[in-house]
Amino acid sequence: MSDISVEKLTELEAAAELERLARAIAHHDELYHAKDRPEISDAAYDALKRRNEAIEAHFPALVRDDSPSRRVGAAPALATFAPVVHARPMLSLDNAFSDEDVRDFVGSVYRFLGQLPDDSIAFTAEPKIDGLSMSIRYENGILVSGATRGDGTTGENVTANIRTIAEIPNRLPAGAPAVVEVRGEVYMAKSDFLTLNAQMEAEGKQTYVNPRNTAAGSLRQLDAKVTASRKLRFFAYAWGEMSDMPADTQLGMVEVFRQWGFPVNPLMKRFNSVDGLLAHYRAIGMERPTLDYDIDGVVYKVDRLDLQTRLGFRSRSPRWAIAHKFPAEQALTILRGIDIQVGRTGALTPVARLEPITVGGVVVTNATLHNEDYIKGIGQKGEPIREGRDIRIGDSVIVQRAGDVIPQIVDVVLEEGKKRGEPYQFPHVCPACGSHAVREEGEAVRRCTGGLICPAQAVERIRHFVSRNAFDIEGLGEKQVEFFFNAEDPALCIRSPADIFTLKKRQENSLTKLQNIEGFGATSVKKLYDAIDARREIALHRFLFGLGIRHVGEVNAKRLARAYLSYAAFEKAALEAVPPKEGDRTDKGSEAWQDMLAVEGIGSIVAEAVVDFYGEPHNREVLAALLAEVTPLDEEARVATGSPVEGKTVVFTGSLERMSRDEAKAMAERHGAKTAGSVSKKTDLVVAGPGAGSKLAKATELGIEVINEDDWFKLVGED
């Protein structure tokens, strides 16, 4: 997960991170829901989901079809249990992590219903059980099936195993509706978990990690006798398909479940105020250590079922419920060292090496230290944190399993009379490649400037270099780039952009032939070589974009190409541009610097990134090798087109049927227009295809002209 704030991500960086997050979250969903083998904590998973949602909110045009925000859980594992399609989807809940989040949730309920706070809508509050979600179906009072949640739409048929859980009735009392689906959580009591582990240890077998995983694994045993021996339990709290509703409130339905013989949680209560909900949350939190079952928060639900119906659902969660998660757990240990990791974007991230400590049932040896200011005791806005205490090797530190993929150090405990180590000096040189590491003004992160040579960034940089809007080399996808990068044979390896263009020649002089390697063949290799050769001449803006200079995305690459017209002119400007001396108000910087700032849309942040990139000798060496193989074509000078859209800002939305989105952007730019990804007051024209949604609504609201795709072709004279 990137450490760059969402607001500072470029569109390219955002798209790349959304792709990585989609893969990571899908991977962890499968491990958690389908294989019962989670690799990360719930808090770490929640952090990935929050990061994904934050990026999507900031870049709505980049929301993917496979976005985790549109998905619940994971599809059931194959070839184990028969699939069951839920009559009503089993959705997940949105999360709240603070009192303010809860107040926002309650406020959103009132606003949606058009009611005032003094109308006193009642909410229920109950512990969020850390187990396995289950749907149990009864027809004419007889238990006919039990299914896991799966991906929310399709679960697994575990009926035989459900029947072994003593707390789940096989029959409902007379008078129950003809069709009943009772939903709840299967879990293992802490005491039963300890007994089971003691038994496994006595038998010389491997013990289990935690009650949740054990319950999930026990329920998905192919032999129901194994499930029966595990003493699984159940809490009922919801329902699916019902032929008749026996109550009109959430609390009333749970009481009906109790009367039918299902266990229900005794800590569930009803409140008419946010303060009541939060007080109960804290009370349950205090009682949490004494409970014989694991919980990870408190769930709030609108009590009246008619209001639940009016509130309805979002794509993956109800509007009438939310899960208020408990804060992370903490422990005290010793900081033994600090290592610096270099991320794919060149960010230098300090990682604490700790004396091993158990936090929340997991042994922790590493923790994130975020950035150099965090080590110094300085917050994101320059304010003191931890009362200004810095972090030093040898300190006693408080470790928390929180919202990061790895735990974090949240405080330092200073011991009176104990001599501390020296203040930590954050490196100004990349430990991976030796290039300068710079920190931009206003940034918390220090970054390596050796983008084209740094091994920590190389794979990501090459992927970017061959991507569609850069060199667009067909046959060099993600897997192929990793294969060539990891190849040890000099005739195969691709470690820098220039290596791509020398691959064919190296292969001709080698006994190791690419076409003989699994996954390749004579035809595919020829196509790859042809695709590479086709890019030996490349448009200047594509060349600049492909270099991966920070802040030089597709738009800025085009701006620079149009301003300098040739690569030679751009390179000369980049090498001669000298920023003004810090603190010297009379210094305006070199003439080349001032010229670069005069380019429309290019400010000091972009210009500094260009200067830093070309100021790194390693990058210039890699560029020299690349330019020996590739020729950036001069950009044609922009002339007035006389087009009716010249100088206007155009937004394309919906499904385009006569052209791709990239073709649409290129056509607009060919006619002198600028394209944007979102609608604002600066937008002049919206071209809307079928399925246009929020952008079309925004354009209508702002009174912006909207035309269809056919009208667009007529307008620009290309019909």
From Swiss-Prot:
Q: Which reaction does it catalyse?
A: NAD(+) + (deoxyribonucleotide)n-3'-hydroxyl + 5'-phospho-(deoxyribonucleotide)m = (deoxyribonucleotide)n+m + AMP + beta-nicotinamide D-nucleotide
Q: Which residues form a coiled coil?
A: none
Q: Which residues cross the membrane?
A: none
Cofactor(s) annotated in UniProt: Mg(2+); Mn(2+)
- State what this protein does: DNA ligase that catalyzes the formation of phosphodiester linkages between 5'-phosphoryl and 3'-hydroxyl groups in double-stranded DNA using NAD as a coenzyme and as the energy source for the reaction. It is essential for DNA replication and repair of damaged DNA.
What the record says about family reads: Belongs to the NAD-dependent DNA ligase family. LigA subfamily.
Q: What is this protein called?
A: DNA ligase
Gene for this protein? ligA
